[in-house]
């Protein structure tokens, strides 16, 4: 049963009535039952949740609760479900009973419709209604009506499908509060959104019977019917997830409550169902008002409908306020400082893209399970992942598959080849279970590609478990990208980074021959990025901006700008002002945060440079801004700004060539370089092109057509380590210059002298730019502007300048080979500390004999003993202590107070000053002359003269002598000196008094032998014992331990003598016999010192004893008493030592190769220096390596005669002149010189080219053969001089650049040409008159075969013959054709002057000519005999005569034909290369294969520019003209089929047509259908029209060449740059100047994008022989898989056909692309870097005639690699 239309009409009227009643509601806090749509418009204020409501029958009072519930009444027999009760007064059971009663009672009102009493505030900060306008309200009403109708239809359908009649009752509906719905216009849409839970009551207001329930919108978080909708108070914070906000206000619906950390559980239901998680997902989005997704109004019905709705609309995009309509949010990654995570979502997308290979909505939504993370996935657990979804993005359905994948990739995961490798795999394998619904966020495609780029060498042929192309992109998918944070950006950002790749629309790249790659900006160019991708949030405090630009207009334009997020204010930028009066400003735009309009921080005015390439840079350093123009500081101005730096807003824009909407002025012109550097320093290395050592520049960067121009790089003074910077040199002020004081401080000036390039340059380098002629005045502006003029003549030598002030001490050269130079002698240093004790000296001389001892008692006479052994040496005595001695003589010069080595700045005159003055002592005495000093280093560059001359000035006066250096610090103790000489014997001391006798002590037991004690003092003599009876003489005893009679035995030595004790003097008894030796007695106490006895008589000197053995050192004795002061010794007199050996070589200073001329040649002779002390003798150094020959230095003034001093100071003779040195190496070629003056009149030129064929003359009477050829005619007079030819191109060779050479000597007789075929001997005929036919009739008749005919009668004059067809050059004789199209303009040359010269020597005999047989004309009247013709070398011959015609009457004499003997005609280009040496200089060569004309020149040949081809007209009746010219074979070999052009083949003149090493094309076998010639005779096949093999193009039209490399390559090409470089090399080798790049896709480029956009649609693709392969580049990618023209050939750079030559056995070509030219990342041999068998690359078979056939082949194969010319460039731009 269909729904009743009347009921539907009533429903619509009810809705309209409700809409009209809304504004009439006076109480915003009440809700009328007649106003069911009041929730469509939120009230202005809402602070209470309670309010009056009409109470229906059988309803309960509505209770306000904090936990609102959803009440759903089952329909059609469905299970009745409800949630937790909202009121404590009604338990669930009672509430259920109430509902049942309401449904079963007599009242027709069935299910209750809970309506919120009061709408809560939409936001705590919202004070007023966010009105979207009347249009939004109308759209809401219309949407509600549409949902009502849909609800009614579905209700009727459900009721009838159940088989029962549904009464008129309202469907249970949940109405959201007014504040929980927010709308925002988006185009023509209004989006409604539920942002919070829905308060309801089971006993809320219901509608009456017979009416429909109020329609409602299905919330995006619609839950299961039993799921309590708990609302988190804040978005959860999970690792790697960024919950984004798109709110435009500052309000937050989250409050300050703690977010939940785990997914919410249901009682017994596990995790939240899918719909409940959807609510969590969207609440986390922190949505307020600006929502970018349209959510349709859906009815709340039963499960199947909910499931179907959620499958389509359940996954809603996270909204964004980004202007592009896409979400782009940056969040920090926990635990990884300096990273950012980007979540990207489309404006209306719902997850992954449709073509994604990952698990889609179906696999990750309907069957998703949240499981605990397996313990084996520790890699992911470290990232904070505890639970993960299955199935994951790799379609794994259980943990076993996940663990197997981790185990398979375990080794790769531990390589750490990418800083976020673990994040990538965990996002794929174990997506974290969050409060949001599945599918979770997968990694972005860019994330995958970045990982592949970093880890490709670790994959080793394997691939990632996911194809990067299957992942969503940042632009079109909802994904995660983790990359480096903006705070980790490089210190320099270049132009390519700022523009992006690919280039934006309306910005094109060109290769400028002077500056290289440049980018063209027009009025429609548009480039913009987010600034935080390249710069940190807090921009650099000090920085520099470098530009290389060429403005095209005089209008103002912004070069670079960083704007705020609204693009209203330029925070940082550079702008060129409009040109006025030949001047323009360069302004630095710098706006502090908070300003309402753009501010100008600094501005500089300088001459306009429109149309000129100009280098300039802005350096922001502290409180100043400096402008550098062409690498020279132009001006510096103060700059006031805040101290905290420039803070960029979130979403700040970055623009090149414009400023977005912040400034309407766009830059128009070209930009070659733009750099933003973190350092404020600007040096020549920075502001000039510093990418000379690039990095892989192949033809893709500069292209093979890029002409590397020689740039004059300035010298970087930092290459000389440690050399002091010269002080700033300024030009003298001129009239008109500003006198404004430089605002820089002294410290700034000093820094600028070192860090900036200033206005000074090294000698000879000059400065480049448009302001070279202008006078530079740093800090005061540019005084004189204008273009750079020619270099002036050197100025006159100026007078010597005055002596400069004494400069400060410079730095020290830290060179390992430097040698200190002795300075002036300083004062003597303070006395050092006493040295260590020296080694013991030798024994002294024997002392004087001592006093006679007392006569002892006469003992018994013993036997003489044997000589005793030498005793041990005694210990050294303690040193004496006496008063301080007088000061010693001055010592040698001490070491320098600096530890590093000295240089020229430490020599005399270096000028120390400052604190060193306080250390200086009194002036010492002048020392002897010192040795010659080392050569000095080059001085500072002199200031420029007024006239700008760079010639060196005269040498300055010598500087004043420097101050003496300070005294040196005390040196370290020296090593022990050698033993001194023996001193004289000392004076004997006085004899001491006798001491008292000590009391003997008790006798102790015998102890062990103790160590030898110190010598004691002499004791008193003991009492003599009784004399015993003499015993018998004993035998001689053994040698005793006697002591040598030396120093120890003298008086006072302190060593006791072992003697027997004596008793008191008794009577002398008889001699007794010697007794036995007794034990040693106890040593007595030391006795008192005895008195000094009187001097005894001098005894007889005893014999010297033997030297005793060295004893072991004894213990140190006690300190003795101070000895008496000795007399001073005599001064030693020593002779001066011998001169020391030669000192080490002088300091070696590192210099660059450009400075060798300054250092390696002797400088000017200086004045003799002050004599110094002789330096210490140093060790002889090793022989150094031979230095390179330096360039001659500037000639200095002649110095005074010098004097050479010897090391000891003596003056030697004058220096002698040395032997003549060897000649130096040849210097490099100099720069190109300027054009020279007009030359003098040259010698006569060579004969000109033969003229065009003349008109066909009337046939003359046959000549008389009797005259024959017995005599040669006389040479005719010389012709008039020809017109002046164009000037020749300058020839550049490796030795020099020659502008114009002198005329050479006349050439010798050329080589005789090959003789023609021998013809039949004919009879001599009479000489005939010269006709107008442009061939040699004599030679023609000589070759004709026939009998002599009789002389005919004089016939009547015949009619004039029909005019011939337009001329065909060498193949026919006719009048000239119509003029062709205008040719390319030639190079203008100076007007030439010439004189008539003598005739040249006769050339060699040329080969036979070629031609066609003409039609026979009517006989003409006989003519009189003509004069003989010119000699043979000046005739044009025809090797194939026509049949003889009938004799006719004699005709009038014709004019002399043109000479054509100096032309060689060859069939192929290779033949010309083989035989070009046989052709004399000045001859022409015509190559039939190419239809090109060349001229033989000295050491080569040159191509001749021809006019446009004029096609032969059809339908003239001329059979010869209508036929294809026959193939001509004039040499041994196989010919090619000639191509017929119906249009011009003229190319513009180009210098690269001259090949230094022209290619040698291999001789080919003829193609099928072409006869093979075995001789040099001309072969004439039957004349018939032929067609060329392939379509050809017109040479004057733009074309793109497709050429193959000379060898096949495998997949390992060293990347796309390696393949590009081979295309570049081989193209240059054969003289092709275009930009050739490999016909390959790679990671960074699609094959389709290689060719310039402007040349893709209309420029044909041709091969090396200009045969058309494809109509255009676009046609290759039009779906035909790169279909080529039928019969197309592809040649290599060396001219071989790759389809027929065996060098390419496999006729396939690599391309790595799909049919549309997009890169196939899974099939390009790992970015063309591997040749393993397992890797594959996309290839195509050329046998099928296609270039983009889809065939995956192993990278181990060697296939053809093609090179495509990526842009058409005229010859003038190459």
UniProtKB/Swiss-Prot annotation:
Give positions of region: Nonhelical region 11 (NC11): 1460-1774
The ranges of region (Triple-helical region 2 (COL2)) come to: 823-896
| Domain Laminin G-like, first and last residues per copy | 522-704
- Give the signal peptide, or none: 1-26
Write out the ranges of the annotated region (Triple-helical region 5 (COL5)).
1163-1204
Q: Which UniProt keywords apply?
A: Basement membrane, Cell adhesion, Collagen, Disulfide bond, Extracellular matrix, Glycoprotein, Hydroxylation, Metal-binding, Phosphoprotein, Proteoglycan, Repeat, Secreted, Signal, Zinc
The effect of residue 1593 to A is: Reduces zinc binding by 60%. Abolishes zinc binding
Please outline how this chain is modified post-translation.
Prolines at the third position of the tripeptide repeating unit (G-X-Y) of the triple-helical regions are hydroxylated. Undergoes proteolytic processing by CTSL/cathepsin-L and elastase-like proteases to generate both non-collagenous domain 1 trimers and endostatin monomers. In tissue extracts (brain, skeletal muscle, heart, kidney, testis and liver) predominantly bands of approximately 38 kDa are detected; recombinant non-collagenous domain 1 shows similar mobility. In vitro, several proteolytic cleavage sites in the non-collagenous domain 1 hinge region generating different endostatin-like peptides are reported.
Gene3D superfamilies xref list = 2.60.120.200, 3.40.1620.70, Frizzled cysteine-rich domain, Mannose-Binding Protein A, subunit A
Region annotation (Triple-helical region 10 (COL10)) maps to 1442-1459
Q: Which GO terms describe its biological process?
A: angiogenesis; blood vessel endothelial cell migration; cell adhesion; endothelial cell apoptotic process; endothelial cell morphogenesis; extracellular matrix organization; positive regulation of blood vessel endothelial cell migration; positive regulation of endothelial cell apoptotic process
Q: Where is this region: Triple-helical region 7 (COL7)?
A: 1301-1333
Disulfide linkages recorded for this protein, renumbered to the chain, are: 370-433, 380-426, 417-455, 444-479, 448-468, 1623-1763, 1725-1755
Asked if Metal-binding is a keyword of the record, the answer is: yes
Identify one Gene Ontology CC term for this UniProt entry.
Answer: basement membrane
The similarity comment for this entry is: Belongs to the multiplexin collagen family.
Q: What does the function comment of this entry state?
A: Probably plays a major role in determining the retinal structure as well as in the closure of the neural tube.
Provide the protein name. Answer: Collagen alpha-1(XVIII) chain
The major lineage groups are:
Eukaryota, Metazoa, Chordata, Craniata, Vertebrata
């Amino acid at each position: 049963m269909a729904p009743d239309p009347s009921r539907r009409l009533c429903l619509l009227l009810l809705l309209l009535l409700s809409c009209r009643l809304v504004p009439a509601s006076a109480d915003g806090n009440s809700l009328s039952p007649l106003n069911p749509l009041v929730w469509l418009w939120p009230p202005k204020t809402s602070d209470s949740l309670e309010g009056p409501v009409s109470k229906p029958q059988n309803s309960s009072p509505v209770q306000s609760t904090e936990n609102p519930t959803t009440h759903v009444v089952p329909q059609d027999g469905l299970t009745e479900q409800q949630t937790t009760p909202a009121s404590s007064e009604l338990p669930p059971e009672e509430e259920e009973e109430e509902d049942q009663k309401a449904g079963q009672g007599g009242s027709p009102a069935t299910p209750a419709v809970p309506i919120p009493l009061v709408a809560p505030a939409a936001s705590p900060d919202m004070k007023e209604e966010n009105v979207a306008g009347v249009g939004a309200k109308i759209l809401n009403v219309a949407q509600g009506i549409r949902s009502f109708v849909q609800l009614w239809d579905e209700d009727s359908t459900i009721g009838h499908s159940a088989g029962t009649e549904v009464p008129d009752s309202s469907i249970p509906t949940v109405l959201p509060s007014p504040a929980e719905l927010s709308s925002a216009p988006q185009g023509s849409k209004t989006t409604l959104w539920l942002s919070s839970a829905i308060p309801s009551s089971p006993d809320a207001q219901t509608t009456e019977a017979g009416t429909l329930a109020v329609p409602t919108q299905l919330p995006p978080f619609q839950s299961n019917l039993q799921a309590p909708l708990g609302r988190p108070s804040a978005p959860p914070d999970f690792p790697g997830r960024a919950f984004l906000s798109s709110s435009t206000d500052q309000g937050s619906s989250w409050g300050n409550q703690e977010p939940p950390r785990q997914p919410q559980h249901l009682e017994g239901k596990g995790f939240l169902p899918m719909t409940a998680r959807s609510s969590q997902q969207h609440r986390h989005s922190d949505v307020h008002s600006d929502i970018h997704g349209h959510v349709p109004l859906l009815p709340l019905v039963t499960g199947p409908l909910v499931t179907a709705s959620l499958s389509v609309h359940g996954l809603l995009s996270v909204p964004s306020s980004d202007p592009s309509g896409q979400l782009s949010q940056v969040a920090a990654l926990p635990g990884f400082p300096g990273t950012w995570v980007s979540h990207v979502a489309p404006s209306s997308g719902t997850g992954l893209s449709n073509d994604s290979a990952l698990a889609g909505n179906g696999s990750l939504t309907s069957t998703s399970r949240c499981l605990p993370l397996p313990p084996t996935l520790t890699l992911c657990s470290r990232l904070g992942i505890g639970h993960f979804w299955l199935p994951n993005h790799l379609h794994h359905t259980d943990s076993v598959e996940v663990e197997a994948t981790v185990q398979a990739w375990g080794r790769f995961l531990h390589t750490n080849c990418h800083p976020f490798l673990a994040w990538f795999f965990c996002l794929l394998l174990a997506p974290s279970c969050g409060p949001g619904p599945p599918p979770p966020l997968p990694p972005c495609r860019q994330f995958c590609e970045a990982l592949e780029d970093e880890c490709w060498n670790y994959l080793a042929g394997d691939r990632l478990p996911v194809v990067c192309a299957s992942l969503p992109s940042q632009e079109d998918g909802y994904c995660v990208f983790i990359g480096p944070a903006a705070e980790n950006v490089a210190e320099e950002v270049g132009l390519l980074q700022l523009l992006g790749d690919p280039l934006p629309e309306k910005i094109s790249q060109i290769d400028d021959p002077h500056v290289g790659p440049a980018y063209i900006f027009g009025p429609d160019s548009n480039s913009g990025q987010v600034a935080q991708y390249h710069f940190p949030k807090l921009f650099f405090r000090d920085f520099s901006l470098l530009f290389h630009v060429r403005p095209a207009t005089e209008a103002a334009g912004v070069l670079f700008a960083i704007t705020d997020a609204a693009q209203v204010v330029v925070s940082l930028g550079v702008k060129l002002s409009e040109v006025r009066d030949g001047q323009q400003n360069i302004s630095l735009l710098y706006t502090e945060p908070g300003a309402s309009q753009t501010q100008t921080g600094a501005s500089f005015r300088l001459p306009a440079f429109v149309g000129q390439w100009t280098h300039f840079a802005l350096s922001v350093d502290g409180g100043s801004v400096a402008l550098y123009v062409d690498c020279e500081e132009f001006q510096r101005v103060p700059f006031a700004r805040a101290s905290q730096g420039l803070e960029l807003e979130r979403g700040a824009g970055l623009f090149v060539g414009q400023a977005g909407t912040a400034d309407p002025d766009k830059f128009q012109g070209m930009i070659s370089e733009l750099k933003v550097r973190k350092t404020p320093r600007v040096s020549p290395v920075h502001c000039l092109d510093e990418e000379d050592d690039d990095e892989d520049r192949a033809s893709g960067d500069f292209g093979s057509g890029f002409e590397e121009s020689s740039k004059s790089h300035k010298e970087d003074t930092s290459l000389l380590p440690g050399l002091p910077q010269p002080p700033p040199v300024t030009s003298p002020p001129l009239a008109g210059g500003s006198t404004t004081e430089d605002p820089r401080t002294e410290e700034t000036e000093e820094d600028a002298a070192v860090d900036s390039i200033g206005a000074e340059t090294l000698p000879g380098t000059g400065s480049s730019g448009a302001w070279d002629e202008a006078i530079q005045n740093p800090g005061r502006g540019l005084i004189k502007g204008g273009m750079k003029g020619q270099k002036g003549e050197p100025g006159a030598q100026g007078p010597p300048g005055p002596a400069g002030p004494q400069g400060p001490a410079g730095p020290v050269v830290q060179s390992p080979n430097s040698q200190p130079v002795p300075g002036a002698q300083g004062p003597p240093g303070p006395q050092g500390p006493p040295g260590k004790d020296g080694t013991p000296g030798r024994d002294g001389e024997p002392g004087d004999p001592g006093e006679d001892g007392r006569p002892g008692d006469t003992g018994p006479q013993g036997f003489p003993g044997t000589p005793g052994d030498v005793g041990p040496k005694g210990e050294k005595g303690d040193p004496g202590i006496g008063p301080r001695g007088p000061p010693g003589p001055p010592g040698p010069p001490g070491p320098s107070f600096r530890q590093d080595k000295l240089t020229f700045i430490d020599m005399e005159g270096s000028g120390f000053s400052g604190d060193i003055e306080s250390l200086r002592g009194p002036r010492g005495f002048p020392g002897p002359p010192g040795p010659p000093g080392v050569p000095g280093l080059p001085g500072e560059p002199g200031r420029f003269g007024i006239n700008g001359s760079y010639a060196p000035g005269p040498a300055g006066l010598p500087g004043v002598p420097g101050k003496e250096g300070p005294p040196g610090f005390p040196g370290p103790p020296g090593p022990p000196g050698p033993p001194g000489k023996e001193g004289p014997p000392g004076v004997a001391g006085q004899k001491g008094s006798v001491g008292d006798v000590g009391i003997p002590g008790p006798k102790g037991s015998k102890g062990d032998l103790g160590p030898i004690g110190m010598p004691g003092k002499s004791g008193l003599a003991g009492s003599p014992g009784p004399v015993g009876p003499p015993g018998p003489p004993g035998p001689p005893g053994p040698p005793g331990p006697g002591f040598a009679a030396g120093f120890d035995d003298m008086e006072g030595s302190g060593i006791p003598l072992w003697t027997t004790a004596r008793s008191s003097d008794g009577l002398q008894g008889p001699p007794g016999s010697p007794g036995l030796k007794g034990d040693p007695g106890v040593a007595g106490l030391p006795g008192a010192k005895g008195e000094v006895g009187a001097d005894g008589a001098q005894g007889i000197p005893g014999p010297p004893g033997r030297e005793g053995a060295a004893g072991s050192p004894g213990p140190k004795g006690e300190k003795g008493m101070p000895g008496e002061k000795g007399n001073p010794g005599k001064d030693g007199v020593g002779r001066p030592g011998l001169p020391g050996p030669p000192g080490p070589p002088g300091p070696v200073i590192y210099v660059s190769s450009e400075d060798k001329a300054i250092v390696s040649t002797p400088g000017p002779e200086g004045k003799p220096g002050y004599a110094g002390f002789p330096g210490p003798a140093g060790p002889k150094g090793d022989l150094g390596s031979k230095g390179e020959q330096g360039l001659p230095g500037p000639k200095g003034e002649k110095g005074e005669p010098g004097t050479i001093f010897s090391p000891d100071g003596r003056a030697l003779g004058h220096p002698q002149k040395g032997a003549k040195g060897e000649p130096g190496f040849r210097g490099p070629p100099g720069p190109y010189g300027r054009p020279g003056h007009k030359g003098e009149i040259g010698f006569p030129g060579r004969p000109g080219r033969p003229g065009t064929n003349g008109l066909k003359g009337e046939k003359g009477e046959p000549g008389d053969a009797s005259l024959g050829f017995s005599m040669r005619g006389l040479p005719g007079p010389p012709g008039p001089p020809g017109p002046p030819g164009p000037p020749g191109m300058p020839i550049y060779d490796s030795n020099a650049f020659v502008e114009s050479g002198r005329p050479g000597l006349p050439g010798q007789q050329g080589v005789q040409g090959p003789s023609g075929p021998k013809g039949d001997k004919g009879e001599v005929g009479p000489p005939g008159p010269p006709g107008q036919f442009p061939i040699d009739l004599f030679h023609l008749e000589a070759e004709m075969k026939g009998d002599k005919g009789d002389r005919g009668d004089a016939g009547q004059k015949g009619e004039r013959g029909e005019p011939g067809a337009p001329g065909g050059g060498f193949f026919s004789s006719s009048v000239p054709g119509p003029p062709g199209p205008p040719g390319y303009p030639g190079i203008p040359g100076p007007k030439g002057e010439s004189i008539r010269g003598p005739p040249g020597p006769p050339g060699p005999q040329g080969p036979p000519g070629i031609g066609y047989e003409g039609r026979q004309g009517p006989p003409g009247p006989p003519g009189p005999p003509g004069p003989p013709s010119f000699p043979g070398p000046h005739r044009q011959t025809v090797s194939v005569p026509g049949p003889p015609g009938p004799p006719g009457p004699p005709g009038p004499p014709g004019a002399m034909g043109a000479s054509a003997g100096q032309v060689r005609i060859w069939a192929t280009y290779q033949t010309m290369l083989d035989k070009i040496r046989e052709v004399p200089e000045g001859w022409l060569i015509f190559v039939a294969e190419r239809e090109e004309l060349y001229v033989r020149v000295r050491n080569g040949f040159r191509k001749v520019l021809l006019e446009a081809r004029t096609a032969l007209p059809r339908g003239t009746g001329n059979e010869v003209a209508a036929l294809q010219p026959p193939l001509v074979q004039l040499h041994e070999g196989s010919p090619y089929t000639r191509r017929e052009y119906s249009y011009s083949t003229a190319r513009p003149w180009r210098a690269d047509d001259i090949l230094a090493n022209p290619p040698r094309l291999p001789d080919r076998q003829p193609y099928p259908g072409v006869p093979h010639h075995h001789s040099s005779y001309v072969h004439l096949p039957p004349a018939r029209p032929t067609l060329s093999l392939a379509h050809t193009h017109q040479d004057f039209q733009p074309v793109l060449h497709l050429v193959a490399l000379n060898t096949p390559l495998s997949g390992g090409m060293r990347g796309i740059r390696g393949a590009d470089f081979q295309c570049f090399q081989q193209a240059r080798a054969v003289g092709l100047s275009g930009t050739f790049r490999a016909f390959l896709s790679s990671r960074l480029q699609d094959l389709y994008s290689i060719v310039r956009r402007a040349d893709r649609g209309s420029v044909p693709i041709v091969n090396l022989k200009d045969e058309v392969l494809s109509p255009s580049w676009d046609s290759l990618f039009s779906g035909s898989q790169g279909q080529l023209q039928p019969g197309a050939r592809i040649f290599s750079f060396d001219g071989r056909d790759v389809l027929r030559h065996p060098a390419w056995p496999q006729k396939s070509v690599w391309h790595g692309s799909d049919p549309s030219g997009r890169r196939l990342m899974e099939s390009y041999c790992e970015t063309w870097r591997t040749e393993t068998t397992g890797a594959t690359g996309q290839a195509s078979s050329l046998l099928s005639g296609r270039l983009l056939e889809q065939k995956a082949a192993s990278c181990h194969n060697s296939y053809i690699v093609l090179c495509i010319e990526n842009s058409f460039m005229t010859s003038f731009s190459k």
